[in-house]
């Protein structure tokens, strides 16, 4: 390399650094901190470093480039997603082995029985809505990926265990499998079900509750309408950081039909008066399958049950923590519902739960029901156990 070429190379390199540096410094025009973030306590420096790191263009370029190489060469994304066939994405929680999975299952089953007992003491009937895994409903799209053996019969084992304990858990797998012929019941790029899948589950729960735990009070009429259908970028695409440089590599967005459920005109006042201050017909506790309004699960339940439904579900905390929180609320203690539907995705049964925010003695009391009722549960007649299905 001649001296002039070396000078040109150095000049180009320095020029690129200056341009990238100036580009990053532009981000400080909208950089602001709180009053307690000062130079003296070091928080301002940390905040500035974090902001600069987030806005530095080379970082985004490197992230996009590395993600594109993983995606194209190895058919992989970041931890959290499994890439199937035909642009289908799955959460890795439905594939990975779980440390201490068997012990976690035993602990969680004990808590489930304890929750059932706590509800019954207040006069509430537990209806456990076990949501089948996406891999169980759409195994044809998982490709060469194989779930760990723990997941093979997890749904069936879950149902068998709660049936032995005498817990009412209508089967949701069979109706969801049947509904696949009419439309998509789970989103292709998301962890969750579609509004149609949520409606199928709600109808099954409504029919089962009407048969085995009919609600008291005057039925209410609800109507569901489609609002709009729009492209929807599922939560699993966040594990494919290809935007903005390689966004063309991302799976195409799902088409999500949003729905809205409202009381039939003239019914709202009567229904509100019936249950106001005296009785709550149905409470719903669960995960983002229930908490996220995009799926309209609450609305579908209202229409299927012909009753108002009070939603206590939470996004991002699994099914057990929201239920334990609900049991400690004044709403439950003062106005317990006739029925509590507990939406519980099957993959959370072997998952570990951090229960540090709860009183250990109270948790121990809840778990005691497994020991005191074990013999009764083993002799109980199974109520509704689904047939074995391939994963």
Curated annotation (Swiss-Prot):
Recorded topology in the membrane: Peripheral membrane protein
InterPro entries, per the entry: AlgJ, ALGX/ALGJ_SGNH-like
E.C. code: 2.3.1.-
Chief subcellular location: membrane
Keyword field contains Membrane: yes
Active-site residues, record numbering mapped to chain: 190, 192, 288
Cleavable signal peptide: 1-35
Pathways involved: Glycan biosynthesis; alginate biosynthesis
Coiled coil (residue ranges): none
Subcellular location as annotated: Cell inner membrane; Periplasm
Keywords: Acyltransferase, Alginate biosynthesis, Cell inner membrane, Cell membrane, Membrane, Periplasm, Signal, Transferase
Gene Ontology molecular function terms on file: acyltransferase activity
Protein's GO biological process: alginic acid biosynthetic process
Entry annotated with the keyword Cell membrane: yes
Gene Ontology cellular component list: periplasmic space; plasma membrane
Domain of life assignment: Bacteria
Family note: Belongs to the AlgJ family.
Function of the molecule: Together with AlgI and AlgF, forms an inner membrane complex which probably interacts with the alginate polymerization-transport complex and adds acetyl groups at the O-2 and O-3 positions of mannuronate residues. Acetylation of alginate is important for the architecture of biofilms and increases the ability of alginate to act as a defense barrier.
Protein name from the UniProt record: Probable alginate O-acetylase AlgJ
